[in-house]
Structures are given as C-alpha cells and as structure tokens.
Amino acid sequence: MNILMLTFIICGLLTQVTKGSFEPQKCWKNNIGHCRRRCLDTERYILLCRNKLSCCISLIISQEYTRRPAFPVIHLEDITFDYSDVDSFTGSPVSMLNDLITFDTTKFGETMTPETNTPETTMPPPETTTPETTMPPSETATSETMPPPSQRALTHN
C-alpha cells in the first residue's frame, strides 16, 4: 500500500514537472512568440531566447492574440472652453502679480529711472588696446630674433 501511494505521488509530481519543461517556451510581448531552434516559414525571427533558441513570431496574425485597442475618436464639437476668467488673467504663472514692474539693475544694461519712468541704457567703459596687447608675445620674440625665410636661405648657403 505504501509503494502504491508513493507511486501516485511521484506520477503527480512528474506531470507538474513535464508541463514546465516540455511545453514550448513563450517569448516576446504578451507571450505571442515561441522559442525554437529554427523558425518556420510562416514565422519571423525577432530575438534570442535562452539556450541559443530563436524567438519566432507568426507572420499571420491569429485571433487568439489580443490586439491593442484603437484610440477613441475625439470630436471637436464636444470640446468647449470656459472664457469666464479671461479678464483676470495677468500673463503671470503666479496669480495677482503685475508683469509691468521692472527692477533696478546694478550691472550694465537697461535701468528704470524712478523720476521719469523711462528706460536708460548704460554702456560699459571702452577697453583701451595698445600695440603690445594686440600681438601675442611669442610672435614678437620670434620676429625679432629670426630673419625672414628669404634671408635664412641665403645665410645657410
């Protein structure tokens, strides 16, 4: 009796194990592909599965796979806008702020004078340049010590 019960238990466990290992493996999105060594003529290779198997997806779309639902159609007649608060909108992301106020700047640029409320533009002071600053120091040193190429050719002969 014990051997018979042990046999039934082993047979029951074997059926559970064989379902996982001998069934063809599924792959891709929503398990629509099958892992095979070589894809059939009606299938296309997409990517690799485990153990060097190819994920093959059928070229013929079957009805057993659920498709993505279509987007709902939006009718423009159904869209309405509420224009009741248009007058109170100031153009600022924060409510009740006035965008017409400008602040005095300490840097060079445009500032508002409080007496006349007119913008004034100030320019930065001009930078004075001298001949020493316009030429790089490496060029001035080499031009005084090295003769021009035509004179160099004459001196080496």
UniProtKB/Swiss-Prot annotation:
UniProt keyword terms in alphabetical order: Antibiotic, Antimicrobial, Defensin, Disulfide bond, Secreted, Signal
Span list, region Disordered: 109-157
Signal peptide: 1-20
Protein location: Secreted
Annotated disulfide bonds: C27-C55, C35-C49, C39-C56
Pfam families: Defensin_beta_2 (PF13841)
Listed Low complexity bias regions: 110-121, 129-145
GO cellular component, one term: extracellular region
Keyword Secreted attached: yes
Main localization, broad class: secreted
Domain of life: Eukaryota
A Gene Ontology BP annotation from the UniProt entry: innate immune response
Annotated family: Belongs to the beta-defensin family.
Function: Has antibacterial activity.
PANTHER family in UniProt: BETA-DEFENSIN 123-RELATED, BETA-DEFENSIN 125
UniProt-recorded name of the protein: Beta-defensin 125
Gene that encodes it: DEFB125
